Every structure is written in C-alpha cells, then in structure tokens.
C-alpha cells in the first residue's frame, strides 16, 4: 500500500478523532493514534464514530516499543544533557512518542497542534526528526482553500510562513520560499508552483 502512515498524538481531541474517522472511512491514510485505547474508544462512541477500530492505537504507557524509543531518544539527545531517566519520562509525551515512531521508520508523518502550541509541536520534531539537509530556517505552511478557482491552483493557495519565524531576514525568506514551494508540490500536488513574496510595511 502506498498510503501514508500518519500519527495523531492528540487522540482525545474531538476534531482530531473525527478527522481520523473520516480518513479511515475514505481509506486515504493509515492512522496511528497515541493514547489509552479505552479512552479513545469511549470518545469515539460518544461522537458516533464508526471507523476508529481500523486505526492502530499505541499507548506509550504499555507499548512494547516504549523502551526502544526511549533509548533512541537518549542516543539522539545525550550530547544535549539527556539521561536515560529523562528519556524514559519524556517518551511518554505523545508528541515525542509520535516523532520517535517517525524517526524509527514506523510512520511517515504527524499531525498535531489542535491542543498544543506551535512551539510544543515543533520542539520534538526539531530535536528528533530535524531539518532537511541544507535547511537551517524552520518554517510552516498552511493550505488555504478558496471558492475562487483562478487563485492559486484551482483555488488552493499554500501560504508560508505564518507561525514560526516572525521577522525573517533575506536568507531565511529565500529558504521559506523554497520550502513552501516544495510543500506545494509534495502535499498539495502543485505541478509547478508560482511563488509570490509579500511584505507588510508596518506592524498592525
């Protein structure tokens, strides 16, 4: 199967679980939910969701992979002061656990931020997965779907960076432009993205 394996660490957030159910119903991705299965199924029942049983549910508190992931976290971060004890504790954080699943090759991506701040979402990704080679500036991109097909690609725009680097310099802006175009190609399937750079003159 060429379906992407997507981790959802915020499994008890209602919008997240509903989106997971929709993705499972449409068979557009393999979904990995992080959390306690009983709590996840209880919320699914409350929300009337029918497809959550098709997801892989992993509870860091009981998973046989937890010790392996904790050791990986320790190895990745020991030069930054990580200890085995700290790693054993931090691996229980769903955001860290999800990034470790990806780093181990057991998943392809993670979606979070419904309950977590941008900083909380990015921190484990930067510590564990890190930036692509040659990229030193972290940036975010969002898909904007409009009702106006002449905008972007059939009404879809990819906008970056709106959340991560508040006052980028020229070099950072160049990297953000390149990364946003790559996101437009890989995520939004744009054939040949046109990049426009906008700058506001003063703060509001």
Regions found by a protein language model. Name each.
Residues 1-204:
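Anion-binding alpha/beta catalytic cores of soluble intermediary-metabolism enzymes, centered on
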